[in-house]
């Protein structure tokens, strides 16, 4: 009885991965904006998350976000090879948010993908679920009300809370802080 219930949950979570990926992308976009506006944030301290490896860097300089949006999804073979080499938690560390220019979510990929694009023109493909997890870890101690709200919503999405509407664009840029750090 327990086994079949667990198996049913696994199937239903697989079937709703696309919807959950869209919801997570919405809240991750808000977290990226909040992360970039928080002046004194420290990198998350957890040994279970691996730092991104140079081999996952997309092998050319990127001219614009449109180029990343139109890039093909990883094949199932490429995805399985990455998981075999780096594990399912293969994701960037906190230091990889320093010069972040844009984050692009590709929910149409299976599994969904996220691409981090930096001011230097380089881009790194990452697992969007673990990217969101790192953002939550980085922001959990922040006392700002809006940060606490977005973190709680993202945690609710992971726990099977209500889904939210997908944004009109999948190119999400961190908000710019006003002059003087306001």
From Swiss-Prot:
It is found in: Virion membrane; Host cell membrane; Host Golgi apparatus, Host trans-Golgi network. Belongs to the herpesviridae glycoprotein L (gL) family. Alphaherpesvirinae gL subfamily. Pfam families: Herpes_UL1. Keywords: Disulfide bond, Fusion of virus membrane with host cell membrane, Fusion of virus membrane with host membrane, Glycoprotein, Host cell membrane, Host Golgi apparatus, Host membrane, Membrane, Signal, Viral envelope protein, Viral penetration into host cytoplasm, Virion, Virus entry into host cell. Gene3D superfamilies: 3.30.390.170. The keyword Disulfide bond applies. This is Envelope glycoprotein L. It is a peripheral membrane protein. InterPro entries: Herpes_gL_N, Herpes_gL_N_sf, HSV_GL_alphagamma. Residues 52-182 form the gL alphaherpesvirus-type domain. It comes from Psittacid herpesvirus 1 (isolate Amazon parrot/-/97-0001/1997) (PsHV-1).
């Amino acid at each position: 009885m327990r086994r079949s219930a667990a198996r049913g949950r696994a199937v239903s979570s697989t079937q709703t991965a696309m919807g959950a990926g869209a919801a997570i992308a919405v809240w991750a976009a808000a977290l990226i904006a909040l992360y970039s506006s928080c002046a004194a944030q420290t990198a998350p301290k957890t040994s279970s998350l691996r730092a991104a490896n140079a081999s996952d860097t997309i092998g050319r300089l990127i001219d614009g976000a449109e180029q990343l949006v139109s890039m093909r999804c990883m094949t199932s073979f490429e995805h399985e090879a990455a998981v075999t080499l780096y594990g399912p938690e293969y994701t960037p560390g906190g230091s990889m948010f320093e010069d972040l220019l844009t984050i692009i979510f590709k929910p149409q990929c299976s599994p969904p993908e996220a691409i981090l694009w930096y001011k230097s023109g380089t881009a790194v493909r990452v697992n969007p679920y673990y990217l969101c997890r790192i953002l939550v870890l980085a922001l959990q101690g922040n006392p700002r009300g809006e940060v606490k709200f977005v973190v709680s919503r993202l945690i609710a999405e992971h726990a099977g809370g209500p889904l939210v509407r997908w944004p009109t664009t999948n190119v999400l840029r961190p908000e710019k802080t006003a002059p003087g750090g306001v």
